[in-house]
Amino acid sequence: MLGGQIRSPKDFGEGDFRSFAPRFSAENFPKNLELVDKITAIAKKKDCTPSQLTLAWLMAQGDDIIPIPGTTNLQRLEENIGAMKIKLSNEEEQEIRQACENAEVKGARYPEAFAKACFADTPPL
């Protein structure tokens, strides 16, 4: 979603897991897109992509935070590396944090049928 290619549930490819997740349903998707739009607006002010802004924000949180971006091609890798050049002011960090804290995520992360598999006990070694 931060990459800008996904703006509605119709943008998911056939068989994409997200098309089954309640968080990405036609009802919940627009509500969850509000945070993406806020991040995008801040990124435009910084002349960077929303993905770069998010990575820069994570890297600014301290040495104990290590972002692991999903990188599917060379263009995304180069974009992610560009995040290292972005410096955020304390005010910008706070603006991003506030946007995240104020966001009301709608819909469960996984379909209800998957819930039992998500919270299973690990077998003893």
Where are these regions (language model features)?
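Phosphate- and divalent-cation-binding pockets in alpha/beta enzyme and binding domains
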Residues: M1, R76-E79
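Aromatic-lined glycan-binding groove of carbohydrate-active enzymes
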Residues: M1-G15, T49
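Short, flexible micro-motifs
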Residues: R7, N73, Y110
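Terminal-tail/helix-coil boundary detector
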Residues: E14-K45, A60, D64, E78-L125
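Helix N-cap / loop-to-helix initiation motif
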Residues: C48-T49, N73, S89-N90
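Glycine/threonine-rich phosphate-binding loop and adjacent beta-strand/alpha-helix elements that clamp
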Residues: L53
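Hydrophobic, secondary-structure "cap" segments at the distal end of domains
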Residues: A56-W57
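Hydrophobic faces of well-ordered beta-strands that scaffold small-molecule active sites
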Residues: P67-G70
